[in-house]
A protein has these predicted regions:
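Cytosolic ends of transmembrane helices, especially the final helix of ABC transmembrane type-1 domains
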Residues: 365, 369, 381-388, 412, ...
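Membrane-integrated ABC transporters
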Residues: 1-210, 224, 228-233, 252, ...
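Transmembrane helices of ABC transporter permease
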Residues: 236-245, 249, 311-361, 431-445, ...
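Hydrophobic alpha-helical transmembrane bundles that constitute the permease/transmembrane domains
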Residues: 198, 202-213, 243-250, 301-304, ...
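Transmembrane helix-loop-helix hairpins at lipid-water interfaces of multipass membrane proteins
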Residues: 194-248, 255, 327-332, 434, ...
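ABC-type nucleotide-binding domain
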Residues: 117, 123, 497, 503-779
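Loop segments that connect adjacent transmembrane helices in multi-pass transporters
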Residues: 273-290, 361-409, 481, 499-501, ...
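Juxtamembrane loop-to-helix connectors within ABC transporter transmembrane domains
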Residues: 215-216, 256, 276-321, 378, ...
Length: 779
């Protein structure tokens, strides 16, 4: 039986890859990227609820069950998905394709008892018990393998997701864009260069074949008859042929380099251009290393299609031309060359799967290693302040050693293939020499003819030998195409075929009406939230961390779409406006300020590229940033380091506020925008906000309640719901959640009953269980 194995692309893909295996078993082909979206995979992985939801959406009837060892041997539908714990202690999914099955309950119990007796007997005799029960699993992180039930149960948690296709399940192949077609579309505008490359290859082939006749003419025509006068002419002609061939080879190389550059620009920039158009959930559910390694995939594809593709064209032309000539020269020797070629092709097919597996492992491990390095460097301050350099280095070392081990296995496979290829070529080359020389000795062939055949035969066999040596690169390109295609097929955040209204300014009330939202398949982040931001009014969102405050800002910026409910601006559904125009109309200061490796001037005017230096200075003064900028050696022309390293948290926030003030929008969203500022600076900025921007709408997310006491409306959030609303004074009078938060910050909170102990905090484990509906987070 052939099992449908699918390897995961990235570290959090295991659930999607397992479901893809089950779908393939039932003749349905669907991409891992599509399945990730359906099951709500994020950086934490996928929970069982999300996977079950995706399976049901595809038309499967599902049942999540927990089984003990005896029940695992009972009859149930396979393939199914099992949850395991990896050796590193991470939750993981594998696909169970086949296993030992004992249908009768009584026989199953007797089987378990017999095994237990055998196990005890082996233990008493000091022997190792050999379990004959087996499981065939597809581990998306490793391979398809058959293992004993004992080995399986070392990692198995007992949780299975059983799946059976219903009448709603539809077999078939998901429509995918062709990366090959995309690449050919890039080559078509370069038809002229491509033609020159092929033409030069053909000319080189002809000249190469002509050069092979040199020895034949020398041995059969000149030496036997002592034609000294002809010798000079022949040497001169073939010297010209050799020089011409070398010059054309140089021109061909230049053409290939130029063609590579012409293809490189639209391919690489096209990839990042597409990535920039993807929705925020794409970035929120992937590590940076997983995205950047696709850039390497694009480079691999380019290399194969430009260099190798043209080499293949030349090799095919050369093999066909020389094949005809060789057959006419000596059919017997040609048959040996054909046999050599067929063995080399067979070798390619034999090593196809080993190379595929090792290439997939290499690319996945490369993404993991890149992500680990990026995270370590980004968090270098945290690493140093906790003196964790050695521990981080150990983590990097572990991943690097894994990469080296994969590389070593890859080298071993390549070496074995190369050795076999060399043996085939050498042994059959010696056979060809023996047969050819015997024919020369028997007078069936001239010495010059044999030498010409030997030279020409290399033109016939070399293309296949080249194919063998390039097999690793070609299969890398195939895997790269698959990985890159899944990204390129990912839908842009906005339908480019639809016409949207362009938002000029926000000049009306903003209304959230019964809005609910969740990230992936997690518990709801917002539940039936309704409120209005009247035009020109200041509205604040307060509440504990994770209560849904920042989620509201992300929905308003159209980073995500509500699961249900509507958001409107001036009575018009927000969905009617283009994403870009909405974001241009809003001045947003996020919690985490991102600064770029540009001048301070360029960093501030990113919100309004056409802004003059005077306008940038005015915005900086509003944000109380002008003074610290003025003290820098180059002031506004000071070039910032990556991510603004070298600036304090408060200085970064002031630059972010300057960006927002420069935009001069009608709606400002301040998400913890002054949390790193001292009280004096914070009060100065908020005085400016309440006075100079009194006519602008504002949504302020704050933990420091003293900054929002003058807001027109304060919304108190808890677990994704608005639990209180009103002005500062009204909420204090209610003595509810807001009063509690205010009292805590003012340092006057006391238990209502003297001597009563504060309530014990909910355990972290309980919180995680509540958030994930009791399901395990899996990677």
């Amino acid at each position: 039986m052939r099992y449908t194995y699918v390897r995961q692309h990235d570290t959090t893909d295991c659930a999607a890859a397992c479901l893809a295996m089950v779908c393939l078993h039932y003749k349905k082909e669907i991409t891992i990227t599509r399945l990730r979206d359906m099951m709500g995979t994020d950086l934490k992985g996928t929970n069982l609820t999300g996977m079950e939801k995706a399976a049901q959406e595809l038309g499967f009837s599902t049942a999540a069950v927990r089984v003990d060892r005896e029940n695992f041997l009972s009859e149930f539908t396979t393939p199914c998905i099992a949850q395991v714990i990896t050796d590193e202690g991470l939750a993981h999914f594998v696909t169970v394709f086949k296993k030992t099955t004992i249908k009768d309950d009584g026989e199953r119990r007797r089987h378990m008892l017999r095994q237990e007796e055998e196990r005890k007997k082996c233990a008493d005799e000091g022997k190792k018990f050999k379990c004959r029960d087996y499981v065939i699993i597809g581990d998306p992180a490793k391979e398809l393998k058959k293992i004993s039930l004992d080995e399986f149960y070392k990692n198995f948690t007992g949780v299975l997701l059983l799946m059976t296709p219903t009448s709603e399940f539809k077999a078939g192949k998901q429509k995918q864009g062709s990366m090959v077609k995309r690449f050919l579309d890039l080559l078509l505008p370069q038809k002229k260069l491509f033609f020159y490359a092929i033409l030069s290859s053909v000319i080189m082939t002809v000249l190469g074949i002509a050069s092979s006749m040199y020895n034949k003419i020398l041995m059969d025509e000149i030496l036997p008859y002592g034609l000294k006068s002809l010798l000079v002419a022949v040497i001169l002609v073939f010297s010209i042929v050799s020089v011409t061939s070398a010059l054309i080879s140089m021109v061909r190389q230049w053409v290939l380099i130029y063609l590579s550059i012409k293809v490189d620009i639209p391919l690489m920039l096209g990839y990042f251009g597409h990535v920039f158009k993807l929705p925020m959930k794409f970035f929120a559910t992937r590590k940076t290393g997983e995205i950047t390694t696709r850039y390497s995939d694009a480079s691999t594809i380019k290399s194969v299609f430009t260099s190798i593709a043209l080499s293949v064209v030349m090799d095919i032309v050369m093999a066909c031309a020389t094949g005809v000539i060789l057959f006419r020269m000596n059919a017997t020797l040609f048959s040996i060359s054909i046999f050599t070629t067929l063995l080399s092709i067979l070798l390619v097919f034999i090593f196809k799967q080993p190379f595929k597996r090792i290439n997939e492992e290499t690319m996945q491990q490369s993404a993991i290693l890149n992500s680990q390095m990026i995270e370590s460097l980004r968090g270098i301050e945290t690493v140093k302040c906790n003196a964790e350099e050695d521990r981080e280095l150990e983590a990097l070392e572990r991943e690097y050693i894994k990469s080296l081990k994969i590389s070593l296995r890859s080298s071993k496979i390549s070496t074995v293939q190369s050795l076999i290829s060399t043996l085939i070529t050498t042994i059959l080359g010696m056979v060809t020499s023996y047969v050819g020389i015997m024919q020369v000795l028997n007078g069936e062939m001239t010495l010059g003819g044999y030498m010409a055949f030997s030279t020409l035969s290399s033109y016939f066999t070399n293309p296949v030998s080249e194919l063998v040596s390039l097999q690793m690169s070609i299969q890398q390109a195939q895997i790269s195409i698959k990985r890159l295609t899944e990204i390129m097929d990912y839908e842009s955040e906005q339908d480019e075929t639809r016409e949207y209204t362009e938002m000029e300014k926000i000049d009306g009330d903003i209304e959230f009406k019964d809005v609910s939202f969740r990230y992936g398949s997690r518990s709801p982040a917002l539940s039936h939230v309704s409120f209005t931001i009247p035009y020109g009014k200041k509205v604040a969102l307060v509440g504990s961390s994770g209560s849904g405050k920042s989620t509201i800002t992300k929905l308003l910026l159209k980073y995500y779409e509500p699961e249900s409910g509507t958001i409107s601006v001036g009575g018009v559904d927000l969905d009617e406006y283009s994403n870009a125009s909405v974001r241009r109309a809003i001045a947003y200061v996020p919690q985490n300020v991102e600064l770029f490796s540009k001048t301070i001037y360029d960093n501030i005017r990113i919100s309004r590229p056409e802004a003059s230096l005077d306008e940038v200075k005015a915005a900086a003064k509003k944000a109380d940033a002008h003074e610290f900028i003025r003290k820098l050696p180059l002031q506004y022309n000071t070039y910032l380091e990556e991510a603004g390293n070298g600036l304090s948290g408060g200085e970064k926030q002031r630059l972010a506020l300057a960006r927002a003030f420069l935009k001069d929008a009608n709606l400002y969203i301040l998400d913890e925008s002054t949390s790193s500022l001292d009280f004096g600076t914070e009060n100065t900025i908020f005085d400016m906000i309440y006075n100079q921007l009194a006519d602008r709408s504002m949504l302020i997310v704050a933990h420091r309640l003293s900054t929002i006491r003058d807001c027109d409306l304060i919304l108190v959030m808890d677990h994704g719901e608005i639990v209180e609303r009103g002005t500062h004074e009204e909420l204090l009078e209610k003595q509810g959640k807001y009063y509690e938060l205010w009292s805590l910050q003012q340092g006057i909170f006391r238990d209502k009953k003297r001597g009563e102990k504060p309530a014990a905090p909910v355990s972290a484990a309980k919180v995680v269980e509540d958030e994930d509906d009791g399901e395990s987070i899996t990677y």
